């Protein structure tokens, strides 16, 4: 039985004070030893240490939104995996659709980041997903398969990898893939991972859904056999909504 995982991706929202308050609100609502599912929050780089101090010693994990694939150097505006580890992060989101869309990340550069993060001892949330045009063209399977295959090149052990399926057309649009649509892609991903890494690894792999998950649809989505939690955007900025989604994942 895979333990569900819910991560709040705060994106470029909340300053330091607001991040501290939201982290405190979540801690107060969930408690310091919540074990119903794995829970993480991903503040901006600027707020990582502040939010991290609030949740230190609790079961809420500190997650980064991105990392660079080099250790250090002349990469203005970037942050290395080792720096994130040193700041208290346990995981990092890599390959989010917004990184691919707005910052030119490719499957190849995503793969470099994945390997560097794993080498530095961070767990990885690898994001994959198709655009509306790709879905309507019937190439969802091809796109997502390529993102998984190429994102994991050279990775022999995926025990510290979570895959997040985020249909780009359902992010921040109010549109949500039906539970059946999401489950179809999640099953396809698990089948592909079985081919690449074998049945035990594929069955252990957790696959999150990330596309306008809300308290109103979380229970139905999380009831699907291959949906193992959520990567939550907008709803994670509201403590009550995020807690409701976490409770849905925990079956409460």
Curated annotation (Swiss-Prot):
GO cellular component annotations of the record: cytosol
Pathway the protein contributes to: Carbohydrate biosynthesis; gluconeogenesis; Carbohydrate degradation; glycolysis; D-glyceraldehyde 3-phosphate from glycerone phosphate: step 1/1
EC number: 5.3.1.1
Domain of life per record: Bacteria
Pfam families, alphabetized: TIM
Location of the active site: 96 (electrophile), 166 (proton acceptor)
CDD domains per the UniProt record, alphabetical: TIM
Catalysis: reaction(s): D-glyceraldehyde 3-phosphate = dihydroxyacetone phosphate
InterPro entries attached to this UniProt entry: Aldolase_TIM (IPR013785), TIM_sf (IPR035990), TrioseP_Isoase_bac/euk (IPR022896), Triosephosphate_isomerase (IPR000652), Triosephosphate_isomerase_AS (IPR020861)
Residues annotated for substrate binding in this entry: 9-11, 172, 212, 233-234
Gene Ontology MF terms: triose-phosphate isomerase activity
Localization (cell): Cytoplasm
GO term, biological process aspect, one: gluconeogenesis
Keywords per UniProt: Cytoplasm, Gluconeogenesis, Glycolysis, Isomerase
Enzyme class: isomerase
Reported function: Involved in the gluconeogenesis. Catalyzes stereospecifically the conversion of dihydroxyacetone phosphate (DHAP) to D-glyceraldehyde-3-phosphate (G3P).
PANTHER family the UniProt entry points to: TRIOSEPHOSPHATE ISOMERASE
Similarity comment: family membership: Belongs to the triosephosphate isomerase family.
Subunit structure: Homodimer.
Name of the featured protein: Triosephosphate isomerase
Protein species of origin: Chlorobium chlorochromatii (strain CaD3)
